[in-house]
Structures are given as C-alpha cells and as structure tokens.
Amino acid sequence: MSIIVALDAKSQYDALSIADQLDPSLCRVKVGKELFTHDGPQTVRILQDRGFELFLDLKFHDIPNTTAQAVCAAADLGVWMVNVHASGGRKMMETCVERLKAGNYRTQLIAVTVLTSMGREDLRDIGLDVEPFEQVKRLAQLTQESGLDGVVCSAQEAKMLRDLLGTEFALVTPGIRPEGANADDQKRIVTPKQAMLDGSTHLVIGRPITKSERPNEMLKQILSSLA
C-alpha cells in the first residue's frame, strides 16, 4: 500500500511549495495535465531530484503508435508510473506495453477505466447505457489482457476487481477522502482504510493533504489510520 499525493497545482512554484513540506520516504507524488502543460518536464525532474517517485497522470489516448511514443517519452523522463485511457482499445494498450518492453523501461503502465466524476447519466450521454461498475469491469479486464500493470478505479469497484483480476494487478484509487473531508468534485469516494481493505494498492489523495495547514502531518495521520 502506498499513498500518492496529487500535486494538482497551477504552477511549478505552487507544486514545489507543497512537495517541500512532504517526506518523499512516506509518499509518491502525482503530476497531472495542468501542471505538466504549464511547466513541462522540468517540474518532473525537480521533484525527482528531491527524492520523489512520480506518477505522470496525463491519460494518453490516441492511435496506437502515437500513444506508445508518448508513453515511452514519459518513461524516458524516468517516471515511476504513467497512464493511458483503456477506452483507446486493446491494440493501443498492447503497442504501449510492447514498446516499453523493447526499451527495457521500468516505468509502470496503468489504464484509466471510468473517471471517478462520471455517473450513469454521464455514461449515457456518451452512448454507453451501462452502470459505471460494469464499464469499469469490462475495461479493467481488457487492460489486464493487454498486459498492463494495473488500472485506475474507484475504491467502490476495488473489491470486485481484486476478486476478478487476482492479487498481482495494481489498483490505483483516486477519490480518497479521510473521515470528515469534503467530497469536492468526486462522486465515488471512500476512506483510506476502507480502500485498503477493499484491495486498493495505491491511494491517490490530493486536497485533504495539499490544502492542509500541515501536509506532512496529515499524511502521517492517514498512514497511521492504515496500520
């Protein structure tokens, strides 16, 4: 079990201001689209120099060759983990896995199933008349069959996926909120302890830590709750 702190900051300065209050031996960090688009690979390198393993959360989704090139570019940065959209399909995901193996990269590759902000009506709007957990199940199985290391999923689906996919498949879970925290824009949320019990291997936690007056103390409290 590990905690990934989401550095959902607008600038490198803001991200580093948070990271400098965290102990890299206690967590990994996640860099997403806004921060990476604003400041690029430099922010990744600085965080790595500070001792953090990094999850580059860019959710690549394109034709197979283009997606694989982007994944390998992320691996060239030395990131610990990168992700793609499982809805890009089997060929796209398999091509990414093949390229990473050919390059002897150690970067873990996972796939996004259904965004945690999406409910049944949101899926219906894009032509998928299914419950979110059914689509998660379908895409998670496809991801495993394609050779990836794991999926991003809601903790509410984690137990079902753990039973379905076995013990070696990573389940990376956003929408984690400690007891009493605001749900913000996440529709499918759960506490850290419950997520761990349900089979999640990595917990993505943002605002409850990054907006805390003492981020590292909040991180320690969450880790203690998992003991």
Curated annotation (Swiss-Prot):
The keyword Repeat does not apply. One of its GO terms (biological process) is 'de novo' pyrimidine nucleobase biosynthetic process. Pathway: Pyrimidine metabolism; UMP biosynthesis via de novo pathway; UMP from orotate: step 2/2. It catalyses: orotidine 5'-phosphate + H(+) = UMP + CO2. Keywords: Decarboxylase, Lyase, Pyrimidine biosynthesis. GO terms for molecular function: orotidine-5'-phosphate decarboxylase activity. It is an enzyme of class 4 (lyase). The active site is at K59 (proton donor). Its EC number is 4.1.1.23. Pfam families: OMPdecase. Gene3D superfamilies: Aldolase class I. GO terms for cellular component: cytosol. Substrate binds at residues 8, 30, 57-66, 116, 177, 186, 206-207. Belongs to the OMP decarboxylase family. Type 1 subfamily. PANTHER family: OROTIDINE 5'-PHOSPHATE DECARBOXYLASE. Homodimer. Catalyzes the decarboxylation of orotidine 5'-monophosphate (OMP) to uridine 5'-monophosphate (UMP). This is Orotidine 5'-phosphate decarboxylase. It comes from Acinetobacter baylyi (strain ATCC 33305 / BD413 / ADP1). The lineage of its organism: Bacteria, Pseudomonadati, Pseudomonadota, Gammaproteobacteria, Moraxellales. The gene is pyrF.
